[in-house]
């Protein structure tokens, strides 16, 4: 009898509480919007970085330095041979 009464109290409390609002249900479209925004931001940052590298003098100077060093090594090897 005591078990029956305690179960009845639990069931009544659940029924009287009513349906709970869906608070933690993630919205899939919102997740995709956030992911799309992140992708666009990343794309813009990468494009800006690549443009910065291609417009700077560093690649040209590096290429010239390697060419000059390679030419000097070739000349030294020719002289020694």
From Swiss-Prot:
It holds the Pfam family ApoC-I. It is found in: Secreted. GO terms for biological process: lipid transport; lipoprotein metabolic process; negative regulation of cholesterol transport; negative regulation of lipid catabolic process; negative regulation of very-low-density lipoprotein particle clearance; triglyceride metabolic process; very-low-density lipoprotein particle clearance. GO terms for cellular component: high-density lipoprotein particle; very-low-density lipoprotein particle. Belongs to the apolipoprotein C1 family. Residues 1-24 form the signal peptide. GO terms for molecular function: fatty acid binding; phospholipase inhibitor activity. Transmembrane segments: none annotated. Keywords: Lipid transport, Secreted, Signal, Transport. This is Apolipoprotein C-I, acidic form. Its main location: secreted. Apolipoprotein C-I is present in acidic (APOC1A) and basic (APOC1B) forms in P.paniscus, P.abelii and P.troglodytes and perhaps also in baboons and macaques. The two genes for ApoC-I arose through a duplication process that occurred after the divergence of New World monkeys from the human lineage. In human, the acidic form has become a pseudogene sometime between the divergence of bonobos and chimpanzees from the human lineage and the appearance of the Denisovans. Pseudogenization resulted when the codon for the penultimate amino acid in the signal sequence was changed to a stop codon.
